[in-house]
Amino acid sequence: MKYLSAWKRWDFKPKWFWISVAVITALKLFLTSFQMGYYTPDLAPLDDTLMYNMAVSITKGEWLGAYDWLTLSKHSFFALWLAVLHWLHIPYLIGGQALYAASCATLTGAFAPVLPERKKKFILYAALLYNPAATAAFTLRVYRDNIFPALCLLVFAGITGYVLRCTNKKAIGWLVLCGVGLGTVYLCREDGIWVWPFVLVAAGVAIWRLARMNETRRKKLRRMALLFASVGVFAACLSAWAGMNQLFYGRFVVSDFSSSEFNAAYGALTRLEAGQEEDGDLIQIPLTQKGRQALYEAKSKYFTALKPWLEDADFQNGYANSETGEYPAGSFYWALRRAAWYAGYYETAQKAQRYFTDLAQEVNALCDSGALEAGPRRSSTAPKITPEYVLPVLKEGFYSLWFCATMQDTAPYMGGISVGRAEDQIQPMEEFLYTRANLAAKAGTAEPYYSPVQMAAYYVLLFIRKIYAVLLIAALAAALCRLFYVIPTVWKDRAQTCQKAAWLAVMGLIGMAVLRAMMIAFVEVASFGIGTYVMYLSSVHPLLIAAAAVGLLAVWKEEENAPAVSL
């Protein structure tokens, strides 16, 4: 009891707080400085290699490079990030870790009003900073998920920071941060809209808090209108990116994969029902062989133009099932785009746009006329949602949450070496990224060799992973118990609205972790079929950590509230 009482009374002095934050941040960067890049130029043409090539093009003043079927195929903010790191001579892996540390600091600062003691803010920051998923092997790839979780945290930090301070006239900076996060998250990944439910609900909470202020109606409405600052910054980010695409390729779009005409064409093709009744697998076949044949027989001009490639065995290798010739959902859109490229429709962005517009109109007309057996109109590249997926998705989703909470598959090093020609493939990547590749192998094996010093750093990170794997589950359970226990205290009439907003924010983080896990579970069950993969779930880990830490550390009782100490 004596030690507990002393702990309650003790807190960091401002100087020692910042020194301690600097020390643990420097230690994290030091440990991760021993990590090495994992480069596979020939094995990831749609992922790592694409982003790297785009980054090189940006540094040459050529934006995303010469136009073809891949140029605007993905949301490519990560390529710009790589180019900026190159210009600043910052090693790729260190840059990613620094960005993640900054996002951890912003989320910690966001919750400062309910974490008035510096020691509690320090614990939250440290817990987020040493998240094992942030140093997992997938982060060693040259791919956008290296920074995606950090960008997501900026969104959560920005809107949470504003909601907890919306009665303060100087809180608009948090809305700007939220807008930057929203913009970069969406520009980084096509599924970046997943953060919007949290933002919209949080905006509603902010409006509720502002409505309860003792101010004139006009002043309340002015403050509520400030919420559009985030939307404005978000729109500015997207407009700037689309403007660059307009300048170089003549199309004002973020991507021609997520554009309306490609979604319409893909959706039209997935309307066809021929052969679907024979497919008993959960992995969807968007357009079966019978469906393709039906389009050929119906004399679909624009789809038949792709037949020489879609039905070619060599072309199908890597896209279709070698035994059945069926294109699964996770690869059909890439096969469709590549076949259109071979057919000459990707000479310019405008020609590609016209082709997919014509393809959508033609296929929809055939379906609507009854010439082809088809379902209702749709415009999307996402798999169809049907009742048969409910149980498999729930099963995979809840397993994914357990997978994340127990920090599975988060070793800080790759189990294999980089694959590529050292002189003309790997070396240029090392020079551009200022990060060495793990090319050395143990004698007589294909296993990577790491020096004793590297292994010492890895063992420290592995030990930290074991601590998280044991404690996070317990911390989450305890946090949930405390959150439900304090409901009468938080939600009584005279309690501060800041406490209510913080309580909702923590529950919202848990809800968003569940949402992300279920989203990825659906894609895994219906489209990919590659098994639970930590990279796609890496945005879940920091949300669980933050919810557990804030749920346990936050001051919920009104009489305990002290003036917040800002970071």
What are these regions (language model features)?
Residues 92-117, 121, 150, 154, ...:
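Transmembrane-helix motifs of polytopic, lipid-linked glycan transferases
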Residues 87-96, 145, 355-510:
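Membrane-interface anchor segments at the N-terminal boundary of transmembrane helices
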Residues 41-46, 50-51, 234-387:
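Juxtamembrane membrane-water interface segments immediately following transmembrane helices
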Residues 76-79, 83, 89-93, 127-151, ...:
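Aromatic- and kink-enriched transmembrane "portal" helix at the membrane-lumen/periplasm boundary
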Residues 1-33, 222-226, 491-505, 560-567:
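Start-transfer (signal-anchor) and selected internal transmembrane alpha helices
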